[in-house]
């Protein structure tokens, strides 16, 4: 009778109450139980209060309760009914497995995306290369056109230069003809002398001899007078050279030094072309005209320009490798 009453009383007690009573009978504290089971004191307290922590799986909780029961000498079979209520087993949630075909489909999609990315990259690179080539070709054609124009202008200048000496020669021949025919007026004098004397033939021959002598003297005199004129001509050269060197003092003078072959065209404010053509390596060019100047340079890297005594910056054209087109303004004149 007493055994049945004790069994009913044990069934009435919960798992936590039975474990706490057994611990107290052994004289153990919650701290001692936690140290022996390697648990937290809060976990031991939750077990005795029949609480199931939300952050603790039911499998671990059932294991802790069994360890606690063995520690306080409580049969595990008596705690099984209470364990089902306090820590029921829960079915584990298993994530559905993805099929191999899904992964293959995703991999195929990623492959198409990568191929499209490479295609776009190749198109961009191709368009960039085509744009650069067209720009470079246009620059080369422009340089060739300007060079052809300058060559045509140089040929025209040569043709005009060859025709000028012909005119000069004609003028010279016209100028020298009167000098050579200047002694001609002496002939009427000879004829007059012949009619006045009316001497025999030997006398006339002597008269002719005397007439010829003055004509030779006149030719010698003309040659002698022409010689000082020829000697005086070089004395005028220093004056002309000084006149050519004088514009170098112009504050708007344009000085260019060439380190390589370069096509160049320089125009002043009046539209006059001061220079148009090809300059060779190590060449120098000094120009003077009415500012501002307009310059076209086929190879900016091959020329060094000084204007008003200061170097002209061509770095922006050199970096882009383009034909340089620039205008050099006139120097402001100081107030007097």
From Swiss-Prot:
Please give the DNA-binding region boundaries.
30-49
What is the first-listed, main subcellular location in coarse terms? membrane
Q: What does the record list as GO biological process?
A: regulation of cell shape
| Keyword entries, A-Z | Cell inner membrane, Cell membrane, Cell shape, DNA-binding, Membrane, Signal-anchor, Transmembrane, Transmembrane helix
GO terms for MF: DNA binding
* Periplasmic topological intervals: 133-336
Residue ranges under compositional bias (Polar residues)?
161-175
* Top-level taxon of origin: Bacteria
Region annotated Disordered, chain positions: 155-243
Quick one: a GO cellular component term? plasma membrane
**According to Swiss-Prot or TrEMBL, what is its membrane topology?**
Single-pass type II membrane protein
Q: Where is the composition biased (Low complexity)?
A: 176-214, 221-243
Q: Where in the cell is it found?
A: Cell inner membrane
Bilayer-spanning residue ranges: 112-132
The residue ranges of the HTH cro/C1-type domain are 19-71
- Which regions of this chain are Cytoplasmic-facing, per the record's topological domains? 1-111
Identify the PANTHER family for this entry. Answer: CYTOSKELETON PROTEIN RODZ, PTHR34475
| Entry note about domains | The helix-turn-helix (HTH) motif in the cytoplasmic domain of the N-terminus is involved in the formation of spirals to maintain the rigid rod shape. As this protein is anchored in the cytoplasmic membrane, the HTH motif may contribute to protein-protein interactions to form the RodZ helix, which is localized beneath the cytoplasmic membrane. The C-terminal domain may be critical for determination of the rod shape by probably interacting with enzymes required for synthesis of the peptidoglycan layer, including PBPs in the periplasm.
The cross-references to HAMAP family, in alphabetical order and at most eight, read: RodZ (MF_02017)
Q: Tell me the function of this protein.
A: Cytoskeletal protein that is involved in cell-shape control through regulation of the length of the long axis.
Similarity comment: Belongs to the RodZ family.
What is this protein's name? Cytoskeleton protein RodZ
Report the source organism: Salmonella newport (strain SL254)
Q: Which gene encodes it?
A: rodZ
